[in-house]
């Protein structure tokens, strides 16, 4: 019976040894890969973590400093990274719809109203639409073709020839001209 027990213990020792070898191999692989990444500087997350740590130390130092009173300096807003920003962006942009100069902080709400989009939009005439209508009116005072039936040139086609292809009817249908009609 001692042979069977020796056999079981040798199997247990063998399986334990194989397991320990596998664990050692995995640890060596992970350690060598981490060393390679750190040595070559390939770990970008490490730079991000170091930058966040530096910024948090600076922010704690600013908060702990009694001479740095954030309430007295209301001209600029300090974000969580310690950077100062003006309360409303002061850069000026030209509206591509109406041509007005708009401060950057009000540009998006202005564009919603100006272009007639968004929840607060309303249909209104802007300078650009008025200018476009004036340009179109000056371009051709007497158009050759008009889709409206009461115009002076209602029987002319886009080419300028008289209405040969079709005849305009009062009920908005087109009747073809056929010989013998």
Swiss-Prot record:
It is found in: Nucleus, Nucleoplasm. Keywords: Activator, Chromatin regulator, Metal-binding, Nucleus, Transcription, Transcription regulation, Ubl conjugation, Ubl conjugation pathway, Zinc, Zinc-finger. GO terms for molecular function: zinc ion binding. InterPro entries: SAGA_su_Sgf11 (IPR013246). Disruption phenotype: Delayed flowering and increased levels of histone H2B monoubiquitination. A zinc finger (SGF11-type) spans 93-114. GO terms for biological process: chromatin organization. The keyword 4Fe-4S does not apply. Gene3D superfamilies: Classic Zinc Finger (3.30.160.60). Residues 126-153 have a biased composition (Low complexity). GO terms for cellular component: DUBm complex; nucleoplasm; SAGA-type complex. The keyword Metal-binding applies. Ubiquitinated in DET1-dependent manner. Ubiquitination probably leads to its subsequent proteasomal degradation. Residues 116-125 have a biased composition (Basic residues). Residues 116-181 are annotated as: Disordered. Its main location: nucleus. Component of a deubiquitination module (DUB module) formed by ENY2, SGF11, and UBP22 in Arabidopsis. Interacts directly with ENY2 and UBP22. Interacts with DDA1. Component of a deubiquitination module (DUB module) that specifically deubiquinates monoubiquinated histone H2B (H2Bub). Does not seem to be a component of the TREX-2 complex. Seems to act independently of the SAGA multiprotein complex. The DUB module is responsible for the major H2Bub deubiquitinase activity in Arabidopsis. Belongs to the SGF11 family. This is SAGA-associated factor 11. It comes from Arabidopsis thaliana. The lineage of its organism: Eukaryota, Viridiplantae, Streptophyta, Embryophyta, Tracheophyta. The gene is SGF11.
